[in-house]
Amino acid sequence: MDYINLNYRPNEGDLLSCMVIKGENLEKLANEIAGESSIGTWTKVQTMKSDIYEKLRPKVYEIKEIGEENGYKVGLIKIAYPLYDFEINNMPGVLAGIAGNIFGMKIAKGLRILDFRFPAEFVKAYKGPRFGIEGVRETLKIKERPLLGTIVKPKVGLKTEEHAKVAYEAWVGGVDLVKDDENLTSQEFNKFEDRIYKTLEMRDKAEEETGERKAYMPNITAPYREMIRRAEIAEDAGSEYVMIDVVVCGFSAVQSFREEDFKFIIHAHRAMHAAMTRSRDFGISMLALAKIYRLLGVDQLHIGTVVGKMEGGEKEVKAIRDEIVYDKVEADNENKFFNQDWFDIKPVFPVSSGGVHPRLVPKIVEILGRDLIIQAGGGVHGHPDGTRAGAKAMRAAIEAIIEGKSLEEKAEEVAELKKALEYWK
């Protein structure tokens, strides 16, 4: 069957996919990708009807050769899928088609999905974030400045009382948000039930002492029924937040959790994303994943730092930021390959985390703006004078930006920042 139609112009109702492919024959590969991701299989079948072919057939409407690698041609292709192909409010089902078997095809020597364009009917079938940026700011009573977050360190090993004490020290030092690390769940030395009540007790104490709103983001990642049980505990304990490791939990769990009756702000940690996003040969871009998570309804999402320890260049990270923050996004044909209208879907609060310390704060804000959660683990707890001093230094670095001061000027007012700048050259 032929799925290539280079004269086709996508209509507003099509779901579009853009990918880089590698193979001996780009046209043949593109044709097989389109078929495998929709109605095709490896041979002609007698059960195929003409009306199925006409109604459900996707169209490869662009094939552009962009290079050669190891004797194979490399090309950029775009495919338009009719929405009739999909159960549109079933993200796992949709992805089983457009991002499923195609990665295992022998003919493909490379296949990386770069972007999707979700049409209006598709977008409106999803809830999106419950709170979004404005809702988070309203909850924490922080109008304009970047939010400051930290992660309790070490990742695992602290006992419940120790964990809560570290969180308290961070809060009173100036941190707004404290979260569990991605691999802290309910280990023997720090059970979830005990940890959440004790840590929220310390949150209340920190709020009383500082006069500021503070929040704890407990990691409820677990098999789904247990995840719901932990969410119920978090609700009973008075937490405004939960954190979910969205990649390892799966698209189904994230979509289902958002459709529950909970009123949590959902913080999405992307642990394991690089297994899909980092390879330039096979996988899915972080931008494409971020668009999916915006639809599914997370309120906060890690996107990278550009200047920290995690992989991701400036243009790529800014493109991800654009897709989760803005109502309408225009293609740049470098990282964003489609215009995207998000209609009434709220924006996601971007999180910059990974190797962050006070000296990096001005550059991060310069690149990504003030609608940002700056999250520092080692950059808080690694301060020579401890967690509280590290929190004060990070908060002072943010305040320097708001006040129009250099870090060095602010350091003359805040000793903890001065020591941090001396420590992290």
Curated annotation (Swiss-Prot):
The record marks K309 as: Transition state stabilizer. Keywords: Carbon dioxide fixation, Lyase, Magnesium, Metal-binding, Oxidoreductase. Binds 1 Mg(2+) ion per subunit. It holds the Pfam family RuBisCO_large_N. Its EC number is 4.1.1.39. GO terms for biological process: AMP catabolic process; carbon fixation. InterPro entries: RuBisCO (IPR033966), RuBisCO_III (IPR017712), RuBisCO_lsu_C (IPR000685), RuBisCO_lsu_C_sf (IPR036376), RuBisCO_lsu_fd_N (IPR017443), RuBisCO_lsu_N_sf (IPR036422). The keyword Iron does not apply. Mg(2+) binds at K179, D181, E182. Substrate binds at K155, R270, H302, S353, G354, G355, Q375, A376, G377, G378. It catalyses: 2 (2R)-3-phosphoglycerate + 2 H(+) = D-ribulose 1,5-bisphosphate + CO2 + H2O; D-ribulose 1,5-bisphosphate + O2 = 2-phosphoglycolate + (2R)-3-phosphoglycerate + 2 H(+). The keyword Acyltransferase does not apply. Catalyzes the addition of molecular CO(2) and H(2)O to ribulose 1,5-bisphosphate (RuBP), generating two molecules of 3-phosphoglycerate (3-PGA). Functions in an archaeal AMP degradation pathway, together with AMP phosphorylase and R15P isomerase. Because the Archaea possessing a type III RuBisCO are all anaerobic, it is most likely that only the carboxylase activity of RuBisCO, and not the competitive oxygenase activity (by which RuBP reacts with O(2) to form one molecule of 3-phosphoglycerate and one molecule of 2-phosphoglycolate), is biologically relevant in these strains. HAMAP family: RuBisCO_L_type3 (MF_01133). Belongs to the RuBisCO large chain family. Type III subfamily. This is Ribulose bisphosphate carboxylase. It comes from Methanocaldococcus jannaschii (strain ATCC 43067 / DSM 2661 / JAL-1 / JCM 10045 / NBRC 100440) (Methanococcus jannaschii).
